[in-house]
């Protein structure tokens, strides 16, 4: 019997109709919360994640307290089942130079408190000068399981470190065929072989079993960014438009960053809304001015100061771009047509 949790969504959510609101509440009442959970945040210009003024440090810590609880698995009424490790990374620049900016653990975040909060304290310290953070708590559905959480996947390319965390599942054979152009071009994947975590060559049967589908999604996106002359927006558009045509039923909730911006994409036929962003504003106007950060979470806090932030749902097939200058939504992103407003920018304001 799956564990379920009754949720009374205290964070304000924009709905297009009252019937849509009722439908989503009903789904939330009966849906088990047993998928991977994602978190990311970006500070606004002139601020780092350290800044405690205007409630910034407080709300981020509350987001991460909730996020840690989502990385656990207990008996009885515990609503989460993300016990296959946790990981976080933070940026102080567009490239990640120090190994201490990344942590990966094979343990459930909910029970790995010492390591979790040591890293959080470091990430939010003044010395770190951090401006972007990403996190993932894992319920393994593809590839190796008893390993430190491999999300977010990282690649340093052309002097910039890219990162991706994913919730969902996509057929690995479909992804391999996309990356290799149906087996005719192995140049990209040979240059960036997927990990097998100690189980041999990725093309061998054993090695392939341990490859994680999310890393192949990352490689496919990065190949398209390269092919689009390092234009992230166009690369994401090219990669996701093809992927949605080839594998429209796979769950593809993605957080992607280049160290300058955060790109959050939601794609799932599940009726549960499971990716939200906050623009830093509060429900209660007396708490404004707003926090000087934007965040993305699969399941935002419902209590405390972070629970009083405005949290907006990212709809099916929507891309939300969180930059230091604002947030831009792209509805039905895979069908987006590039226009003059998009230009050749690597990030979208």
Indicate residue ranges for each PLM-predicted region.
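Surface-exposed intrinsically disordered loops and tails
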Residues: 66-76, 183-206, 286-288, 339-344
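Secretory targeting signatures
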Residues: 1-33
């Amino acid at each position: 019997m799956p564990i379920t949790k009754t949720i009374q969504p205290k964070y304000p959510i924009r709905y297009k109709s009252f019937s849509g609101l009722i439908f989503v509440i009903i789904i939330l009442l009966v849906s088990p919360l047993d998928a991977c959970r994602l978190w990311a945040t970006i500070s606004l210009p002139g601020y780092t994640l350290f800044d405690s003024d205007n409630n910034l440090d407080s709300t981020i810590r509350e987001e991460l307290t909730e996020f840690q609880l989502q990385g656990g698995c207990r008996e009885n009424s515990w609503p989460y089942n993300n016990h296959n490790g946790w990981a976080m990374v933070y940026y102080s620049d567009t490239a990640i130079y120090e190994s201490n900016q990344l942590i990966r653990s094979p343990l459930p975040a909910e029970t790995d408190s010492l390591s979790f909060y040591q890293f959080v304290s470091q990430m939010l310290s003044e010395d770190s000068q951090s401006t972007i953070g990403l996190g993932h708590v894992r319920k393994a559905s593809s590839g190796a399981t008893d390993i430190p959480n491999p999300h977010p996947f990282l690649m340093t390319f052309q002097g910039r470190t890219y990162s991706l965390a994913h919730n969902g599942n996509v057929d690995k054979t479909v992804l391999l065929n996309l990356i290799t152009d149906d087996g005719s071009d192995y140049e990209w994947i040979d240059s960036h072989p997927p990990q097998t975590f100690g189980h041999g060559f990725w093309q061998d049967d054993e090695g392939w079993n341990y490859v994680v589908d999310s890393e192949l999604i990352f490689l496919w996106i990065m190949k398209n960014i390269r092919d689009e002359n390092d234009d992230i927006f166009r690369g994401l558009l090219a990669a996701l438009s093809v992927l949605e045509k080839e594998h429209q039923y796979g769950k593809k909730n993605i957080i992607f960053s280049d160290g300058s911006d955060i790109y959050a994409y939601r794609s799932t036929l599940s009726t549960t809304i499971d990716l939200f962003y906050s623009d830093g504003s509060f429900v209660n106007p007396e708490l404004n001015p707003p926090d000087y950060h934007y965040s993305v979470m699969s399941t935002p806090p419902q209590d405390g100061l972070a629970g009083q932030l405005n949290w907006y749902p990212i709809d099916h097939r929507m891309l939300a771009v969180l930059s230091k200058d604002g947030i831009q939504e792209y509805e039905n992103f895979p069908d987006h047509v590039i226009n003059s407003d998009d230009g050749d920018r690597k990030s979208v304001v």
